[in-house]
Amino acid sequence: MEIEVGEPEAQRLKLPWCREAHWRETLPAMLNELDPGPIELDCRDWQLGCRDLHQLRELLNKEGVTLTRIHANLRETLVSAAALGYPTHMASPQGNSSKTRSSDTQPKPKTPQKLLFHQGTLRSGDHLSAEGDVLLLGDVNPGARISAGGDVMVWGRLRGIAHAGQDGDTKAKIVALQLRPLQLRIADAVARGPEDQPQPGLAEEARLEGDTIMIEPARANRFNG
């Protein structure tokens, strides 16, 4: 784990890479080296849920340090951070590859999609749109729309209209804690939402298989934490 100066008057705490050490083992020593004040956390390639980030925040607060921003290489970690209300930044995976690899042969990382975080319920007539992925902490009521160039993630009830992959991305997904929309769209495919009652406490995921939109229980890491 490393500490460096980020933006003016803000430290940056870097967790170790997964292959180097577990962050829980190295954190206590690093906490003793922190100066009171704002800090940015770089989670690198760790997949951290809301509980993990909440625990980190509490440990930092005890040292008089305020967490202001979270960087990560994994989208799942950024989703958890955004759900807690933190500004996020998708970091490039540099430094996690072999040091012996030539810079000429090292593949360039794929440019990450931006994650738009919005807190609040969308009501009839509202439309929330994002170029990349979108995470909504709230409900999408009937008559409201949510759309994204990438994934649509709703930490609540989706009962309006959702369009993922609006620019043609057939790999995009729609995830919600309760997926009962009036209409689903992924790329150019269109489907109506299911009419049966969802299983309590089970998030659902819509994805494209061929030309058909399939709905199934969401993978655990879609709403990690």
From Swiss-Prot:
The gene is minC. Keywords: Cell cycle, Cell division, Septation. The keyword Lyase does not apply. It comes from Prochlorococcus marinus (strain MIT 9313). This is Probable septum site-determining protein MinC. GO terms for biological process: cell morphogenesis; division septum assembly; regulation of cell septum assembly. Interacts with MinD and FtsZ. Residues 87-112 are annotated as: Disordered. Residues 91-108 have a biased composition (Polar residues). The keyword GTP-binding does not apply. Pfam families: MinC_C. Belongs to the MinC family. PANTHER family: SEPTUM SITE-DETERMINING PROTEIN MINC. Cell division inhibitor that blocks the formation of polar Z ring septums. Rapidly oscillates between the poles of the cell to destabilize FtsZ filaments that have formed before they mature into polar Z rings. Prevents FtsZ polymerization. SUPFAM superfamilies: Cell-division inhibitor MinC, C-terminal domain.
